[in-house]
């Protein structure tokens, strides 16, 4: 097959098709905690499209984590609405296998080795529990954990623990992946 140059119309149609599906909408989302005088977040409006890669930047304490926790249903907004038009969950996670969240802290189960920590979501969401060991090992290789499968969390550095958390989030092949500072614990030479 030879090289084919797309016309401007064809190129624009490909872009339009890619971004035609809005997967998340935030309309006037605000959050005020009872312990705070000012809102943590105020009147956030956002559309996230299929295949988007979106980074939320800001200083410490500006509400990035709060926003992500609201998007995945861990906390509710004080006002406004979060919609997931193309997903099976609305304002709360009714089908968590469609969404994965990587927290700032890895939250690994200390009595499980790396392999079992990664496989845990497949055991919880039984529809994916048939996943072959080969696929799990592909994810282990992808995040740079080959050779660490039998290690326990206490034997891992902070960066390696975060890799386990990222692998665990990827194993269900979620439609939406939310990550809260996932690379902060990884050293420069070991980042993906």
List each model region and its residues:
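ABC ATPase NBD coupling module
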Residues: 87-105, 124, 129, 133
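Short coil-to-helix segment of the ABC ATPase nucleotide-binding domain corresponding to the Q-loop/switch region
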Residues: 112-119
């Amino acid at each position: 097959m030879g090289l084919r140059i797309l016309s401007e119309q064809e190129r624009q149609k490909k872009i339009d098709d890619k971004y035609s599906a809005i997967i998340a909408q935030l309309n006037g989302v605000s959050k005020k905690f009872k312990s705070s005088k000012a809102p943590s977040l105020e009147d956030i409006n956002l559309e996230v499209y299929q295949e988007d890669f979106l980074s939320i930047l800001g200083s410490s304490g500006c509400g990035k984590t709060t926003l992500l926790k609201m998007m995945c249903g861990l906390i509710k907004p004080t006002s406004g609405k979060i919609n997931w038009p193309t997903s099976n969950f609305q304002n709360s996670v009714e089908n968590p296998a469609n969404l994965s969240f990587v927290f700032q802290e890895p939250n690994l189960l200390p009595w499980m080795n790396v392999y079992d920590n990664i496989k845990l979501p497949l055991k919880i969401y039984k529809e994916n529990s048939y996943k072959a060991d080969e696929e799990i090992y592909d994810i282990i290789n992808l995040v740079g954990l080959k050779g660490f499968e039998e290690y326990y969390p206490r034997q891992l550095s902070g960066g390696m623990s975060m890799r386990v958390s990222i692998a665990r989030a990827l194993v269900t092949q979620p439609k939406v992946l939310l990550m809260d500072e996932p690379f902060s614990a990884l050293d420069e030479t070991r980042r993906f």
